[in-house]
Amino acid sequence: MTLAAAAEAPAPTHAFAIAAEEVAMEPLSTATAPAAMEEESSSSGGGGGVGERRSRFRRICVYCGSAKGKKPSYQDAAVDLGKELVERGIDLVYGGGSIGLMGLVSHAVHAGGRHVIGIIPKSLMPREVTGEPVGEVRAVSGMHERKAEMARFADAFIALPGGYGTLEELLEVITWAQLGIHKKPVGLLNVDGFYNPLLSFIDLAVNEGFITEEARRIIISAPTAKELVMKLEDYVPEYSIGLVWEDQNQKQNNLVPELDSGITSS
């Protein structure tokens, strides 16, 4: 898809209102049969080659910076993560940029023959997309819709080093997991201890009674891409809050015709 075509594509309206609905559309099944996992991996839109390691994930959403960072190790980690996804037959969902760590991980996945879905607000395209876009680009109206679409397409989430935007996206999906809105694993690629201060803060919040031990275990971290993805594969969710978002969302959807009717008749 060309950059011009992506920019001209119509974006859905009511971005903030649809966020919760779209997150619940493609829940991750933790009991997918091995044969089905292998079939999904080979038919998910990427190259898919012989020798790919079997994965329960079809797509992983990667959050990361539009800058490369000062250390070469950050850049190496982005490339290594892209290669790890390729080896496991996993496609990539990301923020759509072609610069910084976003560009490195997306090019690595695309070069390996897997499918890449980039989701980016139209207003950011001139800033974060240079040259020919990588893979499939979906232009959306704003940041709320971007995050909802990324969550909807993904079966798991990984955060590489990044800044405010990366932290916002990361903490939001962690909060959604805590509330039971989704049951998808959330991982930190803790390159050179980049996320140690964040993990220390979270541990402090646990000690001070603001985060439960159970909620602390939502976050999975590892120093290398290979180790992190292995941990994500083994993740089993546990929640103390009984909110089942899919059920609540369905009840809300059933009320929509009644609400519309009431608005029309008033």
Swiss-Prot record:
Family matches, as Pfam families: Lysine_decarbox (PF03641)
Catalysed reaction equations from the record: N(6)-(dimethylallyl)adenosine 5'-phosphate + H2O = N(6)-dimethylallyladenine + D-ribose 5-phosphate; 9-ribosyl-trans-zeatin 5'-phosphate + H2O = trans-zeatin + D-ribose 5-phosphate
Keyword Cell inner membrane recorded: no
List of residues binding substrate: E128, R146, K147, G163, Y164, G165, T166, L167, E168, E169, T175
GO cellular component, one term: cytosol
Chain segments carrying region Disordered: 30-52
GO MF, one example: cytokinin riboside 5'-monophosphate phosphoribohydrolase activity
UniProt KW keywords: Cytokinin biosynthesis, Hydrolase
UniProt name for this protein: Probable cytokinin riboside 5'-monophosphate phosphoribohydrolase LOGL8
Organism: Oryza sativa subsp. japonica (Rice)
Lineage of source species: Eukaryota, Viridiplantae, Streptophyta, Embryophyta, Tracheophyta
